[in-house]
Amino acid sequence: MKPLNYAILKHFTKIKGACADDVIEALKGEYGNFKAFNKNTVMSALMTAETNGLLEEKSFDMDKSGNLRIYYHANDEGAATINNYIKD
């Protein structure tokens, strides 16, 4: 099992884009019991990956509760970097 942050990054090499809620839904089967597996931690990981050039903002919208959802994607260079350092 990969560390949670690695799993989050690796997830973006297999999809076209996602927000924190999508990531949580996709990884909850494997990481749902982890204490650190929550929206704040996932959002922090996404923002850190964006700051480091691994992910880019793709779009944004509001959920039914009026909360902002930011969608990210891994561009070709970011995905290549992630795949180079984090193996399946």
Protein language model regions, located:
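N-terminal positioning helix adjacent to the helix-turn-helix/winged-helix DNA-binding module
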Residues: M1-L4, N38
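Hydrophobic residues on short alpha-helical segments
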Residues: N5-F12
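Short capping segments at the starts of secondary-structure elements
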Residues: T13-D22
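DNA-recognition alpha helix
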Residues: D21-N33
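Short, hydrophobic-biased segments on the C-terminal half of alpha helices
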Residues: M43-E50
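A short, conserved structural fragment
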Residues: E50-D61
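Short, Lys/Arg-rich nucleic-acid/phosphate-binding segment
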Residues: S59-I70
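Short, amphipathic alpha-helical interaction segments positioned at domain boundaries
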Residues: I70-D88
